[in-house]
């Protein structure tokens, strides 16, 4: 009996979904359920998926929403719809290396103390070409994970990971309740950070989350101007606040309660952090486009808002923190 569900949440991914499916079909391990969640795509994504599997038969299940719900809701649904012990998500525009699933699955099933196993990602552009950098986050050993968990740290790890679905659900899984209606959908930002941090509470039962320190997936990185950093930063602060509340035996806040509790001064500081993040990304965008003047100006703006932000990004995205 298959013990792993691979879920791909799709929304208007017609340019990339075929390449993603090809990487799934090329996996050295195929003993998993494939669940595709269509988040009310309005392009040709679903036709491409159906045509692909007509030509390349394998088990898959397609579930379609009647309205667009967002990635947070789609993962929340898939996590509860699946019946297997283990779960994995893959973005509809990312590409797995052939041994990715087998490598992570063997690792997590070899040690009952492991509740999630991730990997490193490398960045590619819209054409699938490597652009340098990647995501090299996560602890490589159970000991380093537990040290971090005891210290009440947020747990950053990329989303392409295999995790114990039942343990995740025991701490709430992907949470969508308690958020304001409409956009921005704060539940769609840093949803993986929230999940891993919730699961890190289980360190007290001897459980751990680690990464295989190997690049196993290609992550398609957008190259446009950035403007969403504030939403991510406030979600990170919310996740940290609830981490501390849980560890201190207090009831968690809903996102609405957390936002309403923030003072004008706190919001101002978060906007500074967001401005630094957006400026750095936009500076890199302009420099890549050959627009030296705007690129340098954005870098200066980043340094003005947060002088150490650039160095922190270099450490995380270059792999220095491996």
Segments (PLM) and residue ranges:
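Short, well-formed alpha-helical segments that are part of the catalytic scaffolds
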Residues: 13-26
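Conserved nucleotide-sugar donor-binding catalytic segment
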Residues: 144-232, 237
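A conserved acidic beta->alpha catalytic loop
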Residues: 38-47, 67, 91
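Short loop->beta transition adjacent to catalytic acidic/histidine clusters or analogous donor-positioning motifs
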Residues: 2-5, 25-36, 44, 57-61
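Flexible acidic/His/Gly-enriched loops in nucleotide-sugar-dependent glycosyltransferase catalytic domains
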Residues: 57-58, 73, 101-177
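Glycine-rich, basic loop-to-helix element that forms the pyrophosphate-binding segment
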Residues: 65-82
